[in-house]
Amino acid sequence: MQIKADQLAAHLAWGLRPLYTVYGDEPLLAQEASDAIRAAARAAGFSERKVFTVGNAAHFDWSALLGAAQALSLFAERQLIELRIPSGKPGKEGSDALQRYCEALGADDVLTLIQLPRLDFQQQKSGWFSALDAAGVILRVEPVERRELPAWIAKRLAAQGQRVADGGEALRPWPSLPTASKATSLPPTRSCKSLRCSIRRVA
């Protein structure tokens, strides 16, 4: 099951799936999506958290990941397992391990969050990624297009209790808006807090 970032909140409101995969090259959006999943997990009683980071796939202990879901502590009823693969390349052993991991999912006391960078077409068609897709929810974070930035920023300001004058038109001539594919989401997000001249508090 694949969803977009702006669909995540509504999805989480209906309940959690056992596996979430967040991937893409927009650091802020990926972080926010992961934070939203973590918050929903905490609210659902997933009180223990284990994090695995794959530095070198060839030297990573994949058996530790496979065993983690079966190693609940005496004091934690439910646990969140996070797997981070910065390279997006688990290797052959990792590919096999991820597919076995997905096959073993099903326990209500374990929720898994996998974080990946941007993946190319071949990676998205791989056996391990297909297994993640079949076992849970795939969330791809995409760059915000330049033409969409004014509305995107206005929406974020509204979430802070602020709004843009003239329905967002005040942002259109903003010279510091980055181009679509080259910039991350971080600069305009930080700038949201400095646009005091173009916004006003919602009464």
Task: Tell where the protein language model's regions lie, with residue ranges.
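Conserved beta/loop motifs at nucleotide-recognition and modification sites
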Residues: 1-203
